[in-house]
């Protein structure tokens, strides 16, 4: 790669109250959908994990639609959601946290674009990330000034993975909307947090992140939006993810070279001296190649970096502290390898980007 191979546009969020930044413009959404279809149709000679790109793309489409329908119908009526084999998918996503309106704005844009292009709107719940905070900042008025007060909705748990984190302190969790309302009464007469929190508490799940996302999704449907939600962790257990993972594992050395070269180019173009920004380069430890993936087992509270040793007949997967070692036989068919990767994730080992 060289510095001229990629051109970065300078994008800047607007500073005015009520302003928004949408790129590309919503008016061009249909043309972008058509361009993507044409681009993907040209990938006729690409094979990933023993499957053609076209077949893998169709498999991934089927998986995400099925998974999104199965997940969403546990708390919403999907009678009016119709999906056909030719339906396009428009996608967005975010961590299932108490995010600000600027993030929520994406979901309204998603719904508008889907209706404009007669597509299926899917919100990807980024639950493979970590819980960054269990509190929010609320404006509080004192005699002389307005300050920000931190109000916690829960305590921090031993595991900080969003997809597995449950409620740590029921009393703290249940009293959250009232404690926020007590601080906001000077500024907001009827905060929507109370009705939102009722949906949070009624959600048929023990995972806090899913409680937040399901409550948010129900509010959206009450406002006339029509979309599906699906946790990314669910897709990571599917066959299409496993097949992509197999392709990366088998080509670990080449993948690492391309990945690190892209980081170096980005740093040069933006004149970044911090070697860890935007992300660290992948390492090689002895004969083990690091991949941009996390792994954990039921016995490890924290996620660990994933490493792969590649031989002619097998792939050896392990984490940095060597809490596990898995051997994937390459003498069998790619489909059998995919089944083995899926089987590991159904038992004790998890792989996430």
Write out the residue ranges for each language-model feature.
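Extended, H/D-rich, highly charged conserved domains that either
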Residues: 210-329
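N-terminal regions that are enriched for targeting/export leaders
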Residues: 1-96, 170, 174-176
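Flexible loop/turn segments at secondary-structure boundaries
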Residues: 97-100, 128-133, 300-303
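Extended, compositionally biased non-globular segments
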Residues: 324-353
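Internal, well-ordered alpha/beta segment that forms a basic, Gly-enriched binding/recognition surface
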Residues: 123-220
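An acidic- and aromatic-residue-enriched active-site/binding cleft used to recognize and process polar
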Residues: 93-96, 124-129, 232-237
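N-terminal, positively charged nucleic-acid-binding surface of large information/translation enzymes
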Residues: 2-33, 37-38, 51-53, 109, ...
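N-terminal catalytic cores of NTP/NDP-binding nucleotidyl/phosphoryl-transfer enzymes
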Residues: 85-117
């Amino acid at each position: 790669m060289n510095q001229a191979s990629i051109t970065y546009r300078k994008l800047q969020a607007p500073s005015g109250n009520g302003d928004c930044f949408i790129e590309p413009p919503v008016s061009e959404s249909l043309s972008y959908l058509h361009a993507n279809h044409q681009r993907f149709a040209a990938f006729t000679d690409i094979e990933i994990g023993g499957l053609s790109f076209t077949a893998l793309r169709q498999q991934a489409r089927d998986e995400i639609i099925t998974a999104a329908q199965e997940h969403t119908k546990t708390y919403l009526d999907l009678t009016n959601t119709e999906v056909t084999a030719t339906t396009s998918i428009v996608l967005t996503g975010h961590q299932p946290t108490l995010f600000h309106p600027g993030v929520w704005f994406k979901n309204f844009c998603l719904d508008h674009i889907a209706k404009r292009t007669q597509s299926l709107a899917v919100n990807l719940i980024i639950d493979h990330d970590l819980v960054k905070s269990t509190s929010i900042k609320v404006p509080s008025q004192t005699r002389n000034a307005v300050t920000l007060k931190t109000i916690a909705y829960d305590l921090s748990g031993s595991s900080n993975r969003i997809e597995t984190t449950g409620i740590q302190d029921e009393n703290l969790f249940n009293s959250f909307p009232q404690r926020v309302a007590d601080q906001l009464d000077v500024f907001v007469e009827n905060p929507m947090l109370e009705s939102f929190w009722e949906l949070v508490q009624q959600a048929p799940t023990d995972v806090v992140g899913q409680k937040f996302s399901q409550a948010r999704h129900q509010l959206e449907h009450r406002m006339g939006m029509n979309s599906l939600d699906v946790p990314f962790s669910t897709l990571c257990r599917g066959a299409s993810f496993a097949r992509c993972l197999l392709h990366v594992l088998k080509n670990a050395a080449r993948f690492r070279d391309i990945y690190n070269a892209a980081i170096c180019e980005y740093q040069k173009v933006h004149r970044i001296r911090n070697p860890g920004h935007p992300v660290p380069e992948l390492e090689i430890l002895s004969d083990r190649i690091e991949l941009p993936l996390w792994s954990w087992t039921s016995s490890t509270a924290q996620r660990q970096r994933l490493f792969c040793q590649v031989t002619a007949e097998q792939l050896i997967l392990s984490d940095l502290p060597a809490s596990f070692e898995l051997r994937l036989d390459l003498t069998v068919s790619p489909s059998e390898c995919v089944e083995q990767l899926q089987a590991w994730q159904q038992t004790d080992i998890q792989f996430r980007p």
